[in-house]
UniProtKB/Swiss-Prot annotation:
This is NAP1-related protein 1. It comes from Oryza sativa subsp. japonica. Acts as a histone H2A/H2B chaperone in nucleosome assembly. One of its GO terms (molecular function) is chromatin binding. InterPro entries: NAP-like_sf (IPR037231), NAP_family (IPR002164). SUPFAM superfamilies: NAP-like (SSF143113). It comes from the Eukaryota.
Length: 259
């Protein structure tokens, strides 16, 4: 059957001319491309308008964020708890990082005056035994050629307190050497360097787009889990009390029957 089909086909020779393209089809494709270009232009204009609106409301939100930070400072270990409760960020904090984060008073994300040109993340600490700086800032600048330039504060560690260098350690019963990478290693990574726009910093993006807008959501996760544990303990305690009451009642009935 296959051989018969092959016989029915005309072999194509090198000298065979391609079928002429339908002029009407070409014209339709050209018109479609014009429409598509028009749609792209409208999309770009819409994007610019959205960014203008976002920039306007960034100014409106700023004093609200300032008030929020004042309240957060009154809650012990707020940012440490929020970080640890976050499914991604919680994995970045080593035990040493957690000790330092107890001194973290505020996190601030600030878009550039031209919102398309970048943003900065600033961590503000109370005076602490780990480093001299009270403010650590990491800035991302976007250029017209879609490159990203990163600048970060050089942390001035106090003597013997530098935990930003990866530490090698072994677990008991495990011969493998494991690397304990500090959050502050990320903070100083890629500093004063440029890279392609597509190679975004996932940690910075999560802080900016997820943690920063509503950190209370993650702080409450931990708080609600503690409340659930307390409720579970209360339920177990109530069950134990009921069992004891039943046993006492049963013993009382037995004593009555004997009498």
């Amino acid at each position: 059957m296959a051989a018969a089909e092959q016989k029915g086909k005309k072999p194509r020779t090198d000298g065979a001319e391609a079928e002429p393209v339908d002029a009407a089809l070409l014209q339709s494709i050209e018109k479609l491309q014009e429409i598509q270009d028009e749609i792209e232009k409208v999309n770009e204009e819409a994007c610019d308008k959205v960014l203008e609106l976002e920039q306007k409301y960034n100014e409106v939100r700023r004093p609200v964020y300032v008030r929020r930070n004042k309240i957060i400072k009154q809650i012990p270990d707020f940012w440490l708890t929020a970080f640890l409760s976050h499914p991604m960020l919680g994995e970045l904090l080593t035990e040493d990082d957690q000790k330092i984060f107890k001194h973290l008073e505020s996190i601030d994300v600030d878009d550039s005056e031209d919102i398309k040109s970048g943003y900065s993340i600033t961590l503000t600490f109370s005076p602490n035994p780990y480093f001299e700086d009270t403010k650590l800032t990491k800035t991302y600048s976007f250029s017209d050629d879609e490159a990203v330039k990163v600048k970060a504060t050089s942390i001035r560690w106090k003597k013997g307190m530098d935990i930003a260098n990866d530490r090698a350690y072994t677990k008991k019963g495990d011969k493998r050497i494991l690397i304990d990478e500090s959050f502050f290693t990320w903070f100083n990574s890629e500093k004063n360097r440029s890279f392609a726009h597509g190679a975004m910093d996932e940690v910075a993006d999560v802080i900016k787009e997820d943690l920063w807008p509503n950190p209370l959501k993650y702080f409450n996760n931990e708080f609600e889990e503690e409340l659930e544990l307390l409720d579970d303990d209360d339920e177990v305690s109530d069950d134990d009390d009921e069992e004891e009451d039943d046993e006492d009642q049963g013993e009382g009935e037995e004593d009555g029957e004997e009498n």
